Each structure stands twice: as C-alpha cells, then as structure tokens.
Amino acid sequence: MAKADVIEVEGKVTETLPNAMFKVELENGAEILAHVSGKIRMHYIKILPGDRVKVEMSPYDLTKGRITFRFK
C-alpha cells in the first residue's frame, strides 16, 4: 500500500551534503533534498555531483526524496 502513492521522477545531483544526503535538481527545475536508499547503500554504489538519478518522493512532502537508481 505504501508503494502505490509514490511519485518517481528523474533528476541530476547538484551537491553532496553530510550524512549521505544530496541536493537533486529535478527535470521540472525544482531542487529537493534526497537520501540514498538501502539497496544503493548496501551495494556501495557511489553517487557524485553530476550523476543522473531516479528519485522517489512522497505526495505529502515534495521537498524530500529517496534516491533509488543511478543511471550509467
């Protein structure tokens, strides 16, 4: 039930912040704060500024998100 109301968008990482947080600029121009999902953390996937990523956002708070995929 929780996955049904998730908004998925693509964006570009603009800045790295402490505690595995990132500033991500979305395709529509908005900038949000995103953290790394557990699977990315578990597989030691590095995310650097300039990377294109897929972000999941809750419809209740559109200023925060979770990075779920890093494009090659």
Curated annotation (Swiss-Prot):
<comment type="subunit">
    <text>Component of the 30S ribosomal translation pre-initiation complex which assembles on the 30S ribosome in the order IF-2 and IF-3, IF-1 and N-formylmethionyl-tRNA(fMet); mRNA recruitment can occur at any time during PIC assembly.</text>
</comment>
<keyword id="KW-0648">Protein biosynthesis</keyword>
<keyword id="KW-0699">rRNA-binding</keyword>
<comment type="similarity">
    <text>Belongs to the IF-1 family.</text>
</comment>
<dbReference type="InterPro" id="IPR012340">
    <property type="entry name" value="NA-bd_OB-fold"/>
</dbReference>
<dbReference type="GO" id="GO:0005829">
    <property type="term" value="C:cytosol"/>
</dbReference>
<protein>
    <recommendedName>
        <fullName>Translation initiation factor IF-1</fullName>
    </recommendedName>
</protein>
<dbReference type="InterPro" id="IPR003029">
    <property type="entry name" value="S1_domain"/>
</dbReference>
<keyword id="KW-0694">RNA-binding</keyword>
<dbReference type="Pfam" id="PF01176">
    <property type="entry name" value="eIF-1a"/>
</dbReference>
<keyword id="KW-0396">Initiation factor</keyword>
<dbReference type="InterPro" id="IPR004368">
    <property type="entry name" value="TIF_IF1"/>
</dbReference>
<dbReference type="InterPro" id="IPR006196">
    <property type="entry name" value="RNA-binding_domain_S1_IF1"/>
</dbReference>
<feature type="domain" description="S1-like">
    <location>
        <begin position="1"/>
        <end position="72"/>
    </location>
</feature>
<dbReference type="GO" id="GO:0043022">
    <property type="term" value="F:ribosome binding"/>
</dbReference>
<comment type="function">
    <text>One of the essential components for the initiation of protein synthesis. Stabilizes the binding of IF-2 and IF-3 on the 30S subunit to which N-formylmethionyl-tRNA(fMet) subsequently binds. Helps modulate mRNA selection, yielding the 30S pre-initiation complex (PIC). Upon addition of the 50S ribosomal subunit IF-1, IF-2 and IF-3 are released leaving the mature 70S translation initiation complex.</text>
</comment>
<keyword id="KW-0963">Cytoplasm</keyword>
<dbReference type="GO" id="GO:0003743">
    <property type="term" value="F:translation initiation factor activity"/>
</dbReference>
<dbReference type="GO" id="GO:0019843">
    <property type="term" value="F:rRNA binding"/>
</dbReference>
